[in-house]
Swiss-Prot record:
Topological domain spans for side Extracellular: 1-36, 87-104, 173-185, 246-263
Gene behind the chain: MAS1
Name the record gives this protein: Proto-oncogene Mas
Result of changing I138D: Fails to activate GNA11
Function per UniProt: Receptor for angiotensin 1-7. Acts specifically as a functional antagonist of AGTR1 (angiotensin-2 type 1 receptor), although it up-regulates AGTR1 receptor levels. Positive regulation of AGTR1 levels occurs through activation of the G-proteins GNA11 and GNAQ, and stimulation of the protein kinase C signaling cascade. The antagonist effect on AGTR1 function is probably due to AGTR1 being physically altered by MAS1.
Species: Homo sapiens
Length: 325
């Protein structure tokens, strides 16, 4: 894949820096697409939102299995938004910022993909675990391992690191010439299987089961806000973030056809990462007291887990949980 053919700035930027700036000498006054100005406007707002959310989750709120996942998801979103903001500014300035700082921009580009991949994996884990809590409530409340959320998050971060490294080394890095186009194609197939045949179906199936079970049972209504948070977050991700992964995979093979669409997909991904704190706020806030309650109260309500696992053995022996049929 010839580096000069790459037009998506997240993939293109390391290439342009490594191959020199000769191509941009006569293009100093090029017009910047409006999509990049929108990205530069949205990404810092989303970065601040997720930063505030992360601070509350880490220092002001009591943790439960669900908030552990949300904390890690917020970190992934912060990483993505920070990188896309810096890269979009560099693109708008015709790579003036990155001149002479090749490895810094490489790190930002890889971190962007890293945050994106992690977001997909974490949302799948959230959906699957919530589905299990509805299907097997007694196990969830009494026998679920105490540090399961933290362990799952650690494994998903490691998987994301592996996938991102493979994608960068085999398909993006122009410095490494020992890898053939077939190597990149093999990585594309692996990522496609992982994303579209493993994680996305798991997310969809578990979310569907969750919706069906909740609609059939009124006992879960008291914690409906948590389920709404999960479902809306997943829907927004599927609409705004998944197209970027599909286009990236197609882009490596058919750059001339899908290159221009990448700018739109990057904007959508930025919107997705910026939207999550808004979702938590509007779902958790009371309609009559919106903008009047403290953020801690709103977030606590949004993330309240009525089925939170119980650690005391006596409680588990005496608790009666209605089985979902």
């Amino acid at each position: 894949m010839d580096g000069s053919n790459v037009t998506s700035f997240v993939v293109e930027e390391p290439t342009n820096i490594s191959t020199g700036r000769n191509a941009s000498v006569g293009n100093a006054h090029r017009q910047i697409p409006i999509v990049h100005w929108v990205i530069m406007s949205i990404s810092p707002v989303g970065f601040v939102e997720n930063g505030i959310l992360l601070w509350f989750l880490c220092f002001r709120m009591r943790r439960n299995p669900f908030t552990v996942y949300i904390t890690h998801l917020s970190i992934a979103d912060i990483s993505l938004l920070f990188c896309i903001f810096i890269l979009s500014i560099d693109y708008a300035l015709d790579y003036e910022l990155s001149s002479g700082h090749y490895y810094t921009i490489v790190t930002l580009s890889v971190t962007f993909l890293f945050g994106y991949n992690t977001g997909l994996y974490l949302l799948t884990a959230i959906s699957v675990e919530r589905c299990l809590s509805v299907l097997y409530p007694i196990w969830y409340r009494c026998h679920r391992p105490k540090y399961q959320s933290a362990l799952v998050c650690a494994l998903l971060w490691a998987l994301s690191c592996l996938v991102t490294t493979m994608e960068y080394v085999m398909c993006i890095d122009r410095e490494e010439e020992s890898h053939s186009r077939n190597d990149c194609r093999a990585v594309i197939i692996f990522i496609a299987i992982l994303s579209f045949l493993v994680f996305t179906p798991l997310m969809l199936v578990s979310s569907t089961i969750l919706v069906v079970k909740i609609r059939k049972n009124t006992w879960a209504s008291h914690s409906s806000k948590l389920y709404i948070v999960i479902m809306v977050t997943i829907i927004i991700f599927l609409i705004f973030a998944m197209p970027m992964r599909l286009l990236y995979l197609l882009y490596y093979e058919y750059w001339s056809t899908f290159g221009n669409l990448h700018h739109i997909s990057l904007l959508f991904s930025t919107i997705n990462s910026s939207a999550n704190p808004f979702i938590y706020f509007f779902v958790g806030s009371s309609k009559k007291k919106r903008f009047k309650e403290s953020l801690k109260v709103v977030l606590t309500r949004a993330f309240k887990d009525e089925m939170q696992p119980r650690r005391q053995k006596d409680n588990c022996n005496t608790v009666t949980v209605e089985t979902v049929v």
